[in-house]
């Protein structure tokens, strides 16, 4: 009998200890918002309380604020965050960045980064850029290639996920793909070996092998450069030289999709866009000119359009001064394309090409340009939340503020529906229940 009591005591002691430890680890954070912009209903809801459970970092409840009534509490400690003077939104998503790129190439030559900065140095700088992205309010990014730094983006992503450095959620495209002669460092003798900003492939089999290799080493996306050498024709169409053959492009898309990965295409003009859409890519990046027939195909195939407007405005004059006079002409063409895509019902996701301009510039300036080009503020915000999360395949995890999703929350003073520029002044950032910036 005594032996039975000893056994029962040991069982109850350890069960009680486990329960105590579990309750101690549970923590609920209440975010008291002056208003919440519901990106799904497109309504501004006043006085909302968001319950965030830790350590899982997910939203437990979203309810109108009622003093004295605490929702979503299982057990454990409670913390309150007062944002009663602010408007809360889902964490913003930038679907086109380059944390390993230095900025406008008219300020610093592209050669400089590839020839004079080591991948190690660039990776350190990339962690700073990733933190900047987060503090700007971007809790998730899709980083579209390292520009000659190999698989360094995979390690930046890993360091963020392991809590080594702060940064947004990342999907990465590693090295990107192009053909011989289409993405070179120019002006060097043929006998001088110089690095490439991309992985060079020629022929369908090389292309397939490169896709497999990049996925093996951590690529979430495959990126292709589909065109080059731009000119404006007399009829106003932005013309180009396509890089890949259709066989090559189809092989890349087929191999990526077979491996359940998506393909992003840098496609600026007529042929690059058309070939990419016909090959079945998942997103068109930049798309300064897209023919109406290709817009129809994009709608039919659910192909996303990531217009990256701000970077065009940012670099156009500098590139024109260097002799690329096509760039200022692109601006009007780009605006017309954006308006036609919007009218046609193409899915548009927010993306900035940050790194193509200096990271000291706030990527949220893209919102103002999207509105200037024809979107409402509500549509622009949706592009950076709901639509962007769908492009990333993370719509069940991020993009809206609702129970079960990660607590990725930002807040601003003022009403972004009245003035979208307030999104350039995010002063509260939470990612996965952890606060990275507060008023």
Task: Give, region by region, the residue ranges found by the protein language model.
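Bacterial N-terminal signal peptides
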Residues: 6-16
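Metal-associated gating/positioning segment near the N- to mid-region
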Residues: 83-158, 162, 247, 279
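Histidine/acidic-residue-rich catalytic or RNA/ligand-binding cores of hydrolases
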Residues: 104-106, 153, 182, 232-234, ...
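His/Asp/Glu-enriched, well-ordered alpha-helical/loop segment
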Residues: 112-114, 258, 330-416
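Divalent metal-dependent hydrolysis catalytic cores, especially in the metallo-beta-lactamase
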Residues: 125-151, 166-176, 219-229, 262, ...
